[in-house]
């Protein structure tokens, strides 16, 4: 049990996919203008990443490896992720149409979120078993959601701040993301 808790902490804080591995920057920058949309996107990504990790493991170990078709991993994982995203999109549309409208184009873009594909491929490269794959996917999504919500809160505060004209918009957002990355470096060495 300790191994799984350390895997979650390590994936969410120390090896954060956005701030350390620079995966998932498109939704990180695009959806982080309001906390409400950031929370919704974080929850949707959390569900997709966890389920996609499970499905990718099952497809890899029960279809690709027995058929000796591991060269198709990337393509098959993208298809698996697309199916999971479509399922998530339909579920959000039925349960919360307001959130569905707020997320707009970013919900289908989870399919092309490189963090989701990166987690699936890293699970294979790190030789995780089924439980470790799901926990790794959950930890990565937890870290993504945490950083997304924190960044959205900072960006909401930046709207009211007196920022020079040349730094408004993407410039100050990237500077803020860099400072967040430096802050998360403080977690290095937390888990050995």
UniProtKB/Swiss-Prot annotation:
One of its GO terms (biological process) is electron transport chain. Signal peptide: none annotated. The keyword Membrane applies. It is a multi-pass membrane protein. Pfam families: Rnf-Nqr. Keywords: Cell inner membrane, Cell membrane, Electron transport, Membrane, Translocase, Transmembrane, Transmembrane helix, Transport. NCBIfam families: PRK05151.1, rnfA. This is Ion-translocating oxidoreductase complex subunit A.
